[in-house]
Amino acid sequence: MRTIISFVIFCVLFFPNFVNAENSGNKWSFYTGMFDFSDDGKKSNLFGIQHINEDLYRETSFGTFQPVTGAFITADNAKYIYTGFQIPKKNGSFTFTPSFTPGLYDEGDGKDLGHAIEFKTEIQISFEISDQSEIGLSYNHISNASLGDKNPGANSYMFNFIKVY
């Protein structure tokens, strides 16, 4: 896990941009944190990556809907791959971003969430550190909405680094 995190940090910080980042419309979020922190028996470190396409959006009365796609893996080899939307609300250098992303979950050696189909709801607060970078903190809840026989859910927190590429 440390090797993966070190490699991603190296790429993010030192890999040259081959496109004009200001006009690309593509953001990547790299995050790490604690999966299911509220369950002492099953909590686990996690690492994930998420793509945010700012060029594909829909204006609604709720705000700007942007598509997101991503995945994470835990130290217990649980995996979640997802796609959905987020609604960023910018206020100065801060951005508040709720999101909803259905996805597929594989428990690996981690927590059994009761079904392969899971729904992730998340809130994130980020701070713009440059025109092309943000740091943030997020909290999410993953649940199968009672699709399975059991629905224990999982609560997680993450530290995010978001960069325009």
Q: Where are the predicted features?
A:
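Short loop/turn motifs that connect adjacent beta-strands in outer-membrane beta-barrel proteins
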Residues: 18-25, 40, 55-65, 90-96, ...
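Outer-membrane beta-barrel "beta-signal"
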Residues: 43-49, 127, 152-165
